[in-house]
């Protein structure tokens, strides 16, 4: 059974790449009102390997300390 972070990644990762890019995160946020620039800044801040996407480790590094989810 996947962890909460793995389940989140799988639900947002529409192209099955194992990563989340700006467009996928924007789509997941739906009508949140966040603009693309803000979402890209968030990804850039947490994108430790600088590939323009968030992978499972990068998501865990952000989400686990922030919300305690596994």
UniProtKB/Swiss-Prot annotation:
SUPFAM superfamilies recorded: EF-hand (SSF47473)
SMART domains: EFh (SM00054)
Keywords: Calcium, Metal-binding, Repeat
Amino-acid positions noted as binding Ca(2+) 1 in the UniProt annotation, renumbered to this chain: 13, 15, 17, 19, 24
Metal-binding found in the keyword field: yes
Molecular function as annotated in GO: calcium ion binding
Pfam families noted in UniProt: EF-hand_7
Residue ranges occupied by any EF-hand domain in the UniProt entry: 1-33, 34-69
InterPro entries named among the record's database cross-references: EF-hand-dom_pair (IPR011992), EF_Hand_1_Ca_BS (IPR018247), EF_hand_dom (IPR002048)
Residues noted as binding Ca(2+) 2 in the record, renumbered to the chain: 47, 49, 51, 53, 58
Protein name per the record: Calcium-binding protein 2
Record organism: Echinococcus granulosus (Hydatid tapeworm)
Lineage of producing organism: Eukaryota, Metazoa, Spiralia, Lophotrochozoa, Platyhelminthes
């Amino acid at each position: 059974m996947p962890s909460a972070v793995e389940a989140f990644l799988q639900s947002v990762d529409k192209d099955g790449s194992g990563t989340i890019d700006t467009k996928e995160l924007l789509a997941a946020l739906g009508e949140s009102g966040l603009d693309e620039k803000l979402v890209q800044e968030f990804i850039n801040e947490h994108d430790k390997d600088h590939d323009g996407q968030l992978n499972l480790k990068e998501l865990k590094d952000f989400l686990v300390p922030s919300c305690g989810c596994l």
